[in-house]
From Swiss-Prot:
Protein name: UDP-N-acetylenolpyruvoylglucosamine reductase
GO terms under cellular component: cytosol
Organism whose genome encodes this protein: Rhodopseudomonas palustris (strain ATCC BAA-98 / CGA009)
Transcription regulation keyword on record: no
Annotated PROSITE patterns: FAD_PCMH (PS51387)
GO molecular function terms noted in the UniProt entry: FAD binding; UDP-N-acetylmuramate dehydrogenase activity
Localization (cell): Cytoplasm
Pfam families, per the entry: FAD_binding_4, MurB_C
Alphabetical keyword list: Cell cycle, Cell division, Cell shape, Cell wall biogenesis/degradation, Cytoplasm, FAD, Flavoprotein, NADP, Oxidoreductase, Peptidoglycan synthesis
Length: 309
């Protein structure tokens, strides 16, 4: 499936644009599941100024979606209408220490942020070492692990709205809840300041090793997977509910519930986005029938089915 090419009109309306505009660009290689259709337009801004130039000149009727690292994401097989924005490490990937704070661009890898903090003997950010995403995604979904989450360490975050206005949001304004931020979905986050706590190198390294060991032992990190599929219901573990419903190893097409960890769906090699999403909905239905609990997706699903763009 392909979309009408609108990049010539966009380029004509934005003569000073420095970033890349690509038409009908495949998104599957940019997601951890390696599935899905193309973006009608993929825009990679050169830097914050370039993003601020682009947004107000984009026609209001064209939808915009910021992709992040593509770890907790399913792009449907029909692709993504409108503009997908991908922030590059070159323009948005910095991570540096300022006193007891870490300034991190939205494209900075969570793991690298943890390492940068550790090198400055700042603790409290070790949980990021085990999260396969970027800081932008962490802001959007209040990413967390090992009993800690982004709301515990965020000082403030910078974002751009559709008018190209740069805005600053403190922790309270992010309206964090479990694996969710209540901030306007149209905002594109570009950086964050995170609070660290002075700690000894041995203490920090021990916590990071603990995080890594847990991932190695309990999660299918060498598979094509999007990470945790469903949110844990209050007081319960999603994987236990999935296992109790008999879904461990369940397959639909090329998608499978991981044998190692039931809250992970994997692409065994030939899965489509529809296979993965259908498998997830099947798991939800079986869990609801077995336990009465309605699991909520943690993985974000975007785009359209084939023929519906």
């Amino acid at each position: 499936m392909s979309f009408p090419d609108i990049t010539p009109e966009l380029k004509a309306a934005m003569p000073e644009l420095r970033g890349r505009l690509l038409s009908n660009e495949p998104l599957a290689p940019l997601t951890w599941f390696r599935v899905g259709g193309p973006a009608q337009v993929l825009f990679t801004p050169a830097d914050e100024d370039d993003l601020g130039y682009f947004l107000p000149r984009l026609p209001a009727e064209i939808p915009v979606m910021c992709l992040g690292l593509g770890s907790n994401l399913i792009v449907r097989d029909g692709g993504l209408p409108g503009v997908a924005i991908r922030l590059s490490p070159r323009g948005f990937g910095e991570h540096r220490v300022e006193g007891e704070m870490v300034h991190a661009g939205a494209a900075a890898l969570d793991k690298r942020v943890a390492e940068t903090a550790a090198a400055a003997q700042l603790g409290g950010l070790e949980f990021y070492y085990g999260i396969p995403g970027s800081i932008g995604g962490a802001l959007r979904m209040n990413a967390g692990a090992n009993g800690r989450e982004t709301k515990d360490v965020l000082i403030d975050a910078t974002a751009y709205d559709r008018s190209g206005t740069r805005k600053l949001f403190d922790n309270a304004a992010m309206q964090f809840s479990y694996r969710h931020s209540g901030a306007d979905p149209a905002l594109i986050f570009t950086s964050a300041r995170l609070r660290g706590t002075p700690a000894t190198p041995d203490h920090i390294r021990a916590k990071m090793n603990e995080v890594q060991a847990h991932r190695e032992l309990a999660q299918p990190i060498r598979e094509k997977t999007g990470g945790s599929t469903f949110k844990n219901p209050p007081g319960q573990s999603a994987w236990r509910l999935i296992d109790a419903a008999g879904c461990r190893g369940l397959k639909i097409g090329g998608a499978q519930v991981s044998e190692m960890h039931c809250n992970f769906l994997i692409n065994t090699g030939e899965a489509t986005a529809a296979d993965i999403e259908t498998l997830g909905e099947t798991v939800r239905a079986r869990v609801k029938a077995q336990s009465g609990v309605e699991l909520q997706w943690e993985i974000k699903r975007i785009g359209v089915a084939p023929g519906k763009g």
